[in-house]
């Protein structure tokens, strides 16, 4: 049974940790599963990621960010996500189109309809079956990053991160059946348990 699951949220909320935990769980059950991430997930996409997150030589406008994220996305979908789904796998993706809408739309202030249009073109209209939103206060989440050097997005001010968080809230409220909102301040084990329960229900597995 093919299934497309995405993880969303602000910086440091634990998306990578929980997406990996879900991947390990599904593989242990013997299910075909592919774990990937945005931006990046392919060699070409990883080059775009480095430009988006670490470029200090040139100014990258919000519109340029929008196109770069979606260029990376289109490559990932064509080379990883769609083939895996067609083969009947469960695909888990750390970030997807909702992040672009939250960051470049609500965070950067681009017209929301423009962001949605470009997202739709790049994704071919592919919508996740389940989106897990790990919600957390942005200040507390960024503290989790520790002493690692911040990238362009982590370096943004608190106002930006709050707009992104609010944006995720609006997006989730518009599609309540697709979203599972979880308090990311819960323990890792508690979050993993909640996620497993929802995924088991989708796959019609015993709880």
UniProtKB/Swiss-Prot annotation:
Matching SUPFAM superfamilies: P-loop containing nucleoside triphosphate hydrolases
Pfam families the record matches: Thymidylate_kin
Keyword Chaperone on entry: no
Annotated positions binding ATP: 9-16
Record key words, sorted: ATP-binding, Kinase, Nucleotide biosynthesis, Nucleotide-binding, Transferase
Domain of life: Bacteria
GO molecular function: ATP binding; dTMP kinase activity
Record GO cellular component, one term: cytosol
Enzyme Commission number(s) from the entry: 2.7.4.9
PANTHER family in the cross-refs: THYMIDYLATE KINASE, UMP-CMP KINASE 2, MITOCHONDRIAL
HAMAP family per record: Thymidylate_kinase
Role: Phosphorylation of dTMP to form dTDP in both de novo and salvage pathways of dTTP synthesis.
Family: Belongs to the thymidylate kinase family.
Name this polypeptide is given: Thymidylate kinase
Source species: Dehalococcoides mccartyi (strain ATCC BAA-2266 / KCTC 15142 / 195) (Dehalococcoides ethenogenes (strain 195))
Lineage: Bacteria, Bacillati, Chloroflexota, Dehalococcoidia, Dehalococcoidales
């Amino acid at each position: 049974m093919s299934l497309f699951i995405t993880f969303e949220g602000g910086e440091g909320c634990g998306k990578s940790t929980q997406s990996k935990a879900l991947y390990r769980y599904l593989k242990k059950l013997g299910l075909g599963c592919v774990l990937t991430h945005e931006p990046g997930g392919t060699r070409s996409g990883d080059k775009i990621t480095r430009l988006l997150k670490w470029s200090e030589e040139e100014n990258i406008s919000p519109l340029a960010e929008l196109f770069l994220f979606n260029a990376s996305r289109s490559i990932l979908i064509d080379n990883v996500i769609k083939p895996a789904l067609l083969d009947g796998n469960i695909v888990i993706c750390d970030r997807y189109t909702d992040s672009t809408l939250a960051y470049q739309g609500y965070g950067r202030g681009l017209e929301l309809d423009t962001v949605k249009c470009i997202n739709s073109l790049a994704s071919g209209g592919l919508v996740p079956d389940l989106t897990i939103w790990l919600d957390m206060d942005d200040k507390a989440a960024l503290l989790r990053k520790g002493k690692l050097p911040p990238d362009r997005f982590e370096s943004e001010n608190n106002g930006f991160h709050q707009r992104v968080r609010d944006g995720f809230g609006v997006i989730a409220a518009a599609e309540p059946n697709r979203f599972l909102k979880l308090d990311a301040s819960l323990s890792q084990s508690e979050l993993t348990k909640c996620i497993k329960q929802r995924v088991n229900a989708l796959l019609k597995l015993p709880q």
